[in-house]
Amino acid sequence: MRIMGLDYGDRRIGVAISDKLGMTAQGQEVIIRKTPEEDLEVIKGLIDKYEVEEIIVGMPKNMDGSLGPRAEKTRDFIDFLQKSLDTPVKVWDERLSTVEAERVLIEADVSRKKRKGVIDKVAASIILQGYLNYQNKLHG
């Protein structure tokens, strides 16, 4: 079963896809946001292309667990996906995923210019990998 991980942002949506066994997450692409409807069509295309059976969307909580303005936008996006898709959509805590993605890219010596283009899909893969690790531990 393939699972899609999404890192939702104001300008871009990072996309990661799991392997068929649900063990590893791989950053796939970055969707440059347009309208919600156009973004949805791109996501639907990826669901079909990768035969995705579940979607995980990272929820940007504050360090104290509270939800800020960015989380409210993400919640609206999740609600939109849940109403528009047959594929189940779940929420996953994404605290510090972008910070972790930035650290990984810096350690890999990726230039600042290139980091900007890939950070969202790396963050999506970190979100998805966290979910996969949790699921695998749960059902180990």
UniProtKB/Swiss-Prot annotation:
GO terms for molecular function: nuclease activity. It holds the Pfam family RuvX. Its EC number is 3.1.-.-. The keyword Cytoplasm applies. Its main location: cytoplasm. The keyword Hydrolase applies. It is an enzyme of class 3 (hydrolase). GO terms for cellular component: cytosol. SUPFAM superfamilies: Ribonuclease H-like. It comes from the Bacteria. Signal peptide: none annotated. HAMAP family: Nuclease_YqgF. Belongs to the YqgF nuclease family. Could be a nuclease involved in processing of the 5'-end of pre-16S rRNA. NCBIfam families: RNAse_H_YqgF. PANTHER family: POLYNUCLEOTIDYL TRANSFERASE, RIBONUCLEASE H-LIKE SUPERFAMILY PROTEIN (PTHR33317:SF4). This is Putative pre-16S rRNA nuclease. It comes from Halothermothrix orenii (strain H 168 / OCM 544 / DSM 9562).
